[in-house]
Amino acid sequence: MTRPWRLLTDGLEVRVRATPRGGRDAVEGIETRADGLPVLKVRVRAAPEDGAANAAIRAVLAEALGCPARAVTLAAGATARVKLFRVAGDGQALAARIGALLGP
């Protein structure tokens, strides 16, 4: 399965499918969309209003990756369901953390 993240020289780029008002804050795994694009499914309780859901996704990713929230930035898709986040840090270590979080 193709991974929804890409290593960068200064971190990691992660493609996320957001589920706002999802009842809980969690990373739920990888999904391959109908167009073949792999995405990391992230569910948050926050509503998609005034950037609240984006901030909640940023916090969920930061916690899951064990990095400060300031290291996670929204690169694209502020109002879209599929978003692109950049995470600053050691890309290899961050990718390993996502892999461990999702399991085999």
Curated annotation (Swiss-Prot):
Origin: domain of life: Bacteria
Pfam families assigned to the protein according to its UniProt record, in alphabetical order: DUF167
SUPFAM superfamilies: YggU-like (SSF69786)
SMART domains per UniProt: DUF167 (SM01152)
InterPro entries, A to Z: DUF167 (IPR003746), YggU-like_sf (IPR036591)
Similarity comment: family membership: Belongs to the UPF0235 family.
NCBIfam families given in the database record: DUF167 family protein, PRK01310.1
HAMAP family, alphabetized: UPF0235 (MF_00634)
Protein name per Swiss-Prot or TrEMBL: UPF0235 protein M446_3939
Organism: Methylobacterium sp. (strain 4-46)
